[in-house]
Amino acid sequence: MLNKQIMVDADNALAGRQEAMAVEPIHFVNGSDITASATQGQQEILFGMGCFWGAERLFWQLDGVVSTSVGYSGGFTLNPTYQEVCSGQTGHTEVVRVIFDPQVLPLEQLLEKFWERHDPTQGMRQGNDLGTQYRSAIYTFSDQQLDIALASQQAYQAALANQQHNTITTEIRPAGPYFYAETYHQQYLAKNPEGYCGLGGTGVCFPPA
């Protein structure tokens, strides 16, 4: 029986398909084009915090966030479906793609939300959600973003250690391909306000600068 908490390797991952997922491009909440690239002066980053429904809502509510979408990244399968990701055979984690204006919302402030609003010490799970698709992750799009993310990890790890918490397991690395999730999942909690939200946290605040 497949253990969904063990990462599949590239040789054993599902192949996927060449055809990209067709998604509704208009953001259900703010009307932005979720398929658009970051424009000059904007940045993008990918956050994995467990189930992407609650994580996306966290970020679209922030001033300075231009657009959000949910999808799959960090694995091997081309253009996976949700069912394939749930199988544990794609290597992908559920992520939120955040496009933001760093002049309004610096990356450091986004990262504070990231660290505080989920438990980054749980490995291949988040709360009761088990599997590699729920692992904590930050996928960056520049050397500067990577440096800031790694520095924030060190700062939050120190705060966790002071409270006798476990070690951070968050995967932090340059972003690979991002594959949009099905339209059903985009802005899910705006369409289904009583839907499941698995966001939690350790209760440890990010230390002040």
From Swiss-Prot:
Q: What is its EC number?
A: 1.8.4.11
Signal peptide annotation: none
Q: Does the keyword Oxidoreductase apply?
A: yes
Top-rank taxon of the source lineage equals: Bacteria
The record's active-site residues are C51
List, in alphabetical order, the Gene Ontology terms for molecular function in this entry.
Answer: L-methionine-(S)-S-oxide reductase activity; peptide-methionine (S)-S-oxide reductase activity
Question: Keywords, A to Z?
Answer: Oxidoreductase
Catalyses which reaction(s): L-methionyl-[protein] + [thioredoxin]-disulfide + H2O = L-methionyl-(S)-S-oxide-[protein] + [thioredoxin]-dithiol; [thioredoxin]-disulfide + L-methionine + H2O = L-methionine (S)-S-oxide + [thioredoxin]-dithiol
Q: Oxidoreductase: present as a keyword of the record?
A: yes
Under the cellular component aspect of Gene Ontology, which terms does the record hold?
cytoplasm
A single Gene Ontology biological process assigned to it is: protein modification process
Task: Identify the enzyme class.
Answer: oxidoreductase
Q: Pfam families annotated for this entry?
A: PMSR
Q: Which family does it belong to?
A: Belongs to the MsrA Met sulfoxide reductase family.
According to its UniProt entry, the function of this protein is described as: Has an important function as a repair enzyme for proteins that have been inactivated by oxidation. Catalyzes the reversible oxidation-reduction of methionine sulfoxide in proteins to methionine.
Q: What is this protein called?
A: Peptide methionine sulfoxide reductase MsrA
* The organism of origin for this protein: Vibrio vulnificus (strain CMCP6)
What taxonomic lineage is listed for the species of origin? Bacteria, Pseudomonadati, Pseudomonadota, Gammaproteobacteria, Vibrionales
Gene name as annotated: msrA
